[in-house]
Amino acid sequence: MFFLPGRGPRGRRTRVARPLAAGAAALLMVLSSGCGAPPGQEGGGAGLADDPRIVWAVTGADRAAHEQVAALWNETHPDRQVEVFFLAPTADEQRQAMFQDLQSRAGQFDVLGLDVIWTGEFADFGYIESLEDLRPEVEGVSLPGAVDTAQWRQELFALPYSSNGAFLYYRTDLIDEPPRTWEELYETGTAAAEEAGISGFVGQGDRYEGFVVSYLELFWAAGGELFDEGQTRSTFLEGDAASTALDFMTRAHATGFYAEGYDSMVEDDARALFQAGEAVYMRNWPYAVPLLSGEAGEESAVADDFAVAPLPTFDGEGTTSALGGLNNAVSTLSDEKEVAREFVLWAATDPGAQALLAENSLPPTMESVYEDSEDPNFRMLGDILAEAHARPPVPGYNSLSLAIQDELHPAFLGQADPGPALEAVERAADDALRQE
């Protein structure tokens, strides 16, 4: 069975707790952000010496998955319980809540569920423990790209937990075989769109993080890297990948290959258009599969006429996708660091815990979960994630992301000179390494 998520990546989900799995330890408590102290914290301190327990601060989205993972740990570790503190579903609010706890030195959280792009920022501030000694436990077990997101300057400060990657959706009634190159995608999509009277391509083109991901996937597909291996300097303008990616987006917009309104389109806008039969190709996350196929109870004009494939590259070799997901880190303020370390390692490497993520529509980071699946699309996702790129978890990633949005979004629309725009991103990339 493939992913059957209850929402798209930008959707909203109820914050009411769902029942725990049968047999789960009763100790697990589910709280919402802003509802007072986390469980066990009324008297301060993240754990008691005679009753070691830890508090796991994690996103309120995908609540059922995290509940079940915590319940499984509690069943198998009755003397070292984990209690879950659910943060707000949105990334900005999550980050704010964790920073508030850390900057005030309240120390209410032992384990921090971090967006994959936050590792460098939290490590640079000294907020999370080094987990470098656990590297042998996850390398060869977790997806390589997921491990990359958990390190800053080649040192592990978190361990992989969940992931995400992109599919190329295409119309099987209009396209015989999925394209291997972006040029082939452009040419076949243009021809098929003209013949069918629809758009060639839909995806994430609004001025937000989705646009950054769309640009970076083209940039990486052209052979680019944002930083050197040690993350000490920007390599954004080395070679022609930066201009190749921007040129493709500019041409796709100018020629009408991108659907009308692409420059204000987010995930579910693209999904709705493709589901209505209004596009040849779509870049999107796996959540769209059951919606398009009708498995989620929605009407779909393409239920029998679409398939998924890896995103192409410019030279036709391999694939590249941006990685999403969460890593777990240990707070430097935790009073139960050893239990916290044990938990984050278990969550990364326990087959049962990782399988629970897949069952709840969250792509896991453990490679064997994909290899053992009978679902061809799920196995394909595993292959995609194995080659995926991590957005660099540098301290100033947020500022770099905003620079890409502010400079390259107008440039691809023909409203700004591409040369100075790319140079501005280069400066922002250098600044992102030094941001405090």
What do the PLM-derived regions correspond to, one by one?
Residues 2-3, 384-436:
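Conserved C-terminal helix/tail region of periplasmic/extracytoplasmic solute-binding proteins
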